[in-house]
Curated annotation (Swiss-Prot):
It is found in: Cytoplasm. The keyword Repressor does not apply. PANTHER family: DNA REPLICATION AND REPAIR PROTEIN RECF. Keywords: ATP-binding, Cytoplasm, DNA damage, DNA repair, DNA replication, DNA-binding, Nucleotide-binding, SOS response. The keyword Cell membrane does not apply. It comes from Pseudomonas fluorescens (strain Pf0-1). Pfam families: SMC_N (PF02463). The RecF protein is involved in DNA metabolism; it is required for DNA replication and normal SOS inducibility. RecF binds preferentially to single-stranded, linear DNA. It also seems to bind ATP. This is DNA replication and repair protein RecF. Its main location: cytoplasm. Belongs to the RecF family. The gene is recF. GO terms for molecular function: ATP binding; single-stranded DNA binding. ATP binds at G30, A31, N32, G33, S34, G35, K36, T37.
């Protein structure tokens, strides 16, 4: 799938704009502060109903404007198209529209418009809290395992019930046993989906990484959130007192993690920022390959400031891998000349100049 038209109103410093991107490579260039990243943020908002620059959406709304809106027309892999729209006002009200109908949740947007983000904060996937890596993992499982979302909702409901009981003791023993069984069953299913996904992801990640950088001894492993040699039911039964003291459940899928190690060390402690960026790129490109294998369509990649922390050879290698995905890519940079030689002649490349919040399409930079 790809975006054939994007309309943005009142997002940060962007003037109202409608533009038609290339179905393949789109390069947005301009000075720092011109609004390039805000274009990616608008697309991210359209696909995920949230910003990647702020946990709060209020700063996204342009000063003195009541709401921000983003519309997009998505060309579907199976043919035809879908119209998406999202609006957010200063009171925090969201409206999501899909083909003229109100949508129930942001998950419906994500299913139609799967997005991958690579930006200067990408190193947080390695250095940040386990929650960030769980989000990465579950994004991938969501897009390849149709049963995941329903199971995830069951898990969250059971987990809320148990945590409420731990804090307030509001359930009788019989009811609590029922919810514990549901929690354990849903946890086992989530663990199964995640384990299968990592098994598929690892060889694709390793191959992709080898085409970007040589990092001998780098390993990717999965921790499910409780002792691999014990049943979750036994772990929960043995930790009730501790869980009550903490006020929440200490073991389960909500504690899962991905572990990247270089020899005996955490990869984040050893690798340079440039190497970390390449590892994260390999992970996200590998996810894109799995999405395309599981469904008739590809991810859309948002790559903010691609040249930063990468030398020419690594920039070229990354561009070639993105190109080989045969998907739509939006890339920002200050100087588009740094990406001049990154693409094959037959690959469609659209060039957009962003200046003081205005977007102007210019000629293909290879002409």
């Amino acid at each position: 799938m790809s975006l054939s038209r994007v309309s943005v109103t009142a997002v940060r410093n962007l003037h109202p704009v409608t533009f038609s991107p290339s179905p393949r490579i789109n390069i947005l260039y301009g000075a720092n502060g011109s609004g390039k990243t805000s274009v990616l943020e608008a697309i991210h908002l359209l696909g995920l109903a949230r910003s990647f620059r702020s946990t709060r959406l209020l700063p996204v709304i342009q000063y003195e404007q009541l709401a921000c809106t983003v519309f997009g027309q998505v060309e579907l892999a199976e043919g035809g198209h879908s119209a998406l729209g999202i609006s957010r006002d200063r009171q925090g009200e969201f409206q999501i529209r899909i083909d003229g109908q109100n949508a129930r949740s942001a998950a419906q947007l994500a299913e139609i418009l799967p997005l991958q983000l690579i930006n200067p904060d990408s190193f947080r996937l390695l250095e940040g809290a386990p929650k960030i890596r769980r989000q990465f993992l579950d994004w991938g499982v969501f897009h390849v395992e149709p049963r995941f979302m329903a199971t995830w909702q069951r898990l969250q409901k059971a987990l809320r019930q148990r945590n409420s009981w731990l804090r307030h003791g509001t359930l009788d023993a019989v009811s609590q046993a029922v919810w514990d069984r549901e929690l354990c069953q849903a946890s086992a299913e989530i663990d199964e989906y995640r384990r299968a996904y990592i098994k598929a992801l690892k060889p694709v990640f390793e191959q992709t990484l080898s085409e970007l950088v040589e990092l001998e001894g780098l390993t990717l492993s999965y921790y499910r959130g409780w002792d691999k040699d014990r049943e979750l039911s036994a772990v929960l039964a043995g930790s009730v007192q501790r869980d009550q003291q903490m006020g929440h459940t200490q073991a389960g899928p909500q504690r899962a993690d991905l572990r990247l190690r270089l020899g005996a060390h955490n990869a984040a402690d050893i690798l340079s920022r440039g190497q970390q960026k390449l590892v994260v790129c390999a992970l996200r490109i590998a996810q894109g390959h799995l999405v395309s294998q599981a469904r008739r369509g590809q991810c859309i990649y948002l790559v903010d400031d691609l040249p930063s922390e990468l030398d020419e050879s690594h920039r070229r290698a990354l561009c070639r891998l993105l190109e080989d995905l045969r998907c739509q890519v939006f890339i920002t940079c200050v100087d588009h000349e740094l990406l001049r030689e990154g693409w094959q002649t037959e690959t469609p490349v659209a060039l957009f100049h962003v200046e003081q919040g205005r977007i102007t399409q210019t000629h293909d930079h290879r002409e």
